[in-house]
Design a protein with these regions (language model features):
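Hydrophobic faces of well-ordered beta-strands that scaffold small-molecule active sites
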Residues: 3-7, 26-30, 60-64, 101-103, ...
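Acidic/histidine-rich catalytic cores of soluble enzymes
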Residues: 135-141, 145-240
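Glycine-rich anion/phosphate-binding loops
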Residues: 39-45, 75-92, 181-188
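Active-site-proximal loop/turn and secondary-structure-junction residues that shape catalytic pockets
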Residues: 9-11, 34, 66-67, 105-109, ...
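Glycine-rich, proline-tolerant flexible connector loops at the mouths of alpha/beta enzymes
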Residues: 32-47, 109
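Acidic (Asp/Glu)-rich catalytic clusters
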Residues: 16-24, 41-61, 91-95, 193-200, ...
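Glycine-rich, aromatic-flanked loop segments that form ligand/cofactor-binding clefts
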Residues: 50-61, 94-162
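Surface-exposed, active-site-proximal loop segments in enzymatic domains
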Residues: 37, 67-84, 109-123, 166-176
Length: 240
């Protein structure tokens, strides 16, 4: 097993010089914060990220994440266009020597927290999710809450360019049940798995965070039963 520290690029408040001093760290898990779901990650951008890490004598172990466009997750008529973009990104990452991609298949909210700077009893800070807070708000208020705590930092999965169309996104998922969402995941994986095998790229799915439905949006990696179903799907797809 290799240990990687997540790093958000040159704008990260934790410089790579500090990351390098963490005992046992083999490298970093990086991202390109300027990329929106559906964008192609270009070779030059990936190489620039990789070189910025390697010049600090660290290794870019993988990417978290290459976000999946909502058209793919909701199964709209545009999904094949964005899957083609995703496939090109897989090829470009592989060409740069990056063979691990983390991803999630959650509608709209890639992750959800109600407090980004919760102070613990020992004075340390952590993320916090409080279901009672969520139950008392409208879905659109979740973005406002996260944005107000971000201190100007661009958060993956909470891109202003995407979430300012929040009501439109909610309509996109109208009628998308857990079964439909899972079928759309299967469609996506069926298209990318042959490319991943050819490019020697491993895909690592992130479980639901939190591990239950929020705002009526379906979740399909929320418990052991879901993950067993997911693993069975992978087995069937790789047998073809």
């Amino acid at each position: 097993m290799k240990w990687g520290f997540r790093w958000y690029g040159e704008g990260d408040s934790i410089p790579l010089q500090n990351v390098r001093q963490i005992p046992g760290i083999n490298g970093v898990i990086g991202t390109l914060l300027n990329k929106l779901p559906g964008d192609i990650w270009e070779l030059a951008e990936i190489e620039e990220l990789k070189q910025s890490i390697e010049k600090e004598e660290l290794t870019l172990l993988g990417i978290e994440s290459v976000a999946i466009h909502d058209a793919i997750k909701a199964g709209t008529e545009e999904r094949d266009h964005y899957i083609d973009h995703y496939i090109q990104t897989i090829k470009n990452l592989s060409a740069c020597g990056i063979h691990l991609i983390c991803y999630s298949f959650k509608p709209i909210f890639g992750w959800a927290k109600t407090n980004l700077f919760y102070e613990n009893e020992d004075g340390s800070f952590s993320l916090l999710y409080d279901q009672a807070v969520v139950e008392g708000m409208e879905p659109s208020e979740m973005y406002t809450l996260i944005h107000s705590q971000s201190k100007g930092f661009k958060l993956p999965g909470w891109e202003e360019e995407r979430l300012k169309k929040f009501n439109q996104l909610m309509e996109t998922y109208d009628g998308v049940t857990e079964e439909v969402l899972f079928d759309n995941l299967a469609y996506f994986l069926k298209r990318i798995i042959p490319v991943c095998e050819e490019m020697n790229v491993k895909m690592a799915i992130h479980p639901d965070d939190p591990p239950w439905e929020i705002f009526g949006l379906p979740r399909i990696t929320k418990n052991l039963s879901d993950l067993k179903k997911y693993c069975l799907l992978l087995t069937l797809l790789t047998m073809d």
